[in-house]
């Protein structure tokens, strides 16, 4: 029977074993499937989240934030608001604590989540110093040391950054900037204006549109009166980029819990991004050596057991883990939105800096041969620029006018001056003719024109144009001098001795050519006192004048304005015809020849003499060092611009490689 029972039970045993095997395989399969899903989610997370944060962190490490604002989360709060406790809970490391100002420099807290197998590691960086940390317990000491180096061994603050990197399986992927706590009154050895200094530093960060402001406020105070939230509202009135964090919910007075819940649910002081609430380690917990991991467990239990706050936990508005997840999501979304604008800003800044660097030229060579070649290139480029201005071929911007066009406008005004002078003199001429006919005509018969009257009137009219011509010369000479000076400034601004020498030569040549031009102009007016014109030219012009007069007479009835006899009228009409004919020819000569004189002396010859004078500088090698001596700040400025360009160039390359 025993044997038989044994035989009878074998199939059941085998069936059970088979079922256990199937169940075991199913469990393994389910576990593997969960691991696969988890691995896939982790992979997606690594592909999307980490690269975004790493990109901005790398740009910040390059120093791009010196040139442009980067997406960031800035943490602000009044002193004793629980700000340090929140950061400790997020990072898993102890940060400097104590009374008074604890955060004395902006602290960039970079948190990077590792896979479970990797070990914790940290690093503190400031200026050119990097300190690797292998034990989380050493973080507080290293941060204090960094702050003492930057802000001094006292209670002052510094705007220089301290960067703390924490890599651990137990931290979120997140980067925060911790700012000094707001204080109102200086105590002890603190500077009298410490409150103003801190607010200025905080405002520098939170006013940037690229910054999300994380405002830490204790739950047991009136949120409307907190300085931190007030500062955030000043720079972000709509609350578009402000998140409120309530701390110390365990210290809330009984009966006020519902009011705290209303604040978290955004019913009291509205912020578009809303509020979160957390419970971190207190001073007693630290003295009792409560670990951060245990503190998280106690926090969870506190919210689960509290009838008022339990709902907030279920809604994802309470606890440090919920806060970490929320901040990571906010930062990633913020970065993604900011990248296109950031890319455009970097491109624009790079172009502006490149243009500015061109003004400072290249570094001066140390080798004497190369230095000679450098100066030759500088002077040759200057001379080529001068040639382009003289020939009217210089490059100008959309709102600028070429030098020759400005000079042409002066010449056009000159033609108008001549025309107006002759036209305004018409009535005076009529009176002079009348005076001569009635007072000075001798034994001449009526109707005979006195040639001396004609000459006298012509000379007087032309003489009135001499000083306006000289004035035009001076205006154009100053215009050319100023233009050439700008060319010198563009080419030699960083070499003050070379620029000063060029300006001196410019002034000397300008005066010399101006004097020569003035002599020629005055000589021309002296020659114009000789009333002369080629016979055939004068006859042709006179004929045209008479034809025009006849046409005018046909169009209107002749009116005897002067009321004199026909002989006088005939005499006056004839002399006016001769005057008009001669004025036409003399006016043509003046409107053409005076501009030619000015062009020749104060533009072409001025430019040629300046170019020759500049080339003569190359003959004295002993002056090269003196001529190429830079302004005190030029070399530093050039180096500064090159460093900024290098940063932006690297930033552009990293943005170009970014998969997003």
Curated annotation (Swiss-Prot):
ISGylated. PROSITE patterns: G_DYNAMIN_1, G_DYNAMIN_2, GED. GO terms for cellular component: cytoplasm; endoplasmic reticulum membrane; microtubule; nucleus; perinuclear region of cytoplasm; plasma membrane; presynapse; synapse. This is Interferon-induced GTP-binding protein Mx1. It is a peripheral membrane protein. Residues 572-660 form the GED domain. InterPro entries: Dynamin, Dynamin_GTPase, Dynamin_GTPase_CS, Dynamin_N, Dynamin_stalk, G_DYNAMIN_dom, GED, GED_dom. The modification N-acetylmethionine is found at residue 1. Induction: By type I and type III interferons. GO terms for biological process: defense response to virus; innate immune response; receptor internalization; synaptic vesicle budding from presynaptic endocytic zone membrane. Residues 367-630 are annotated as: Stalk.
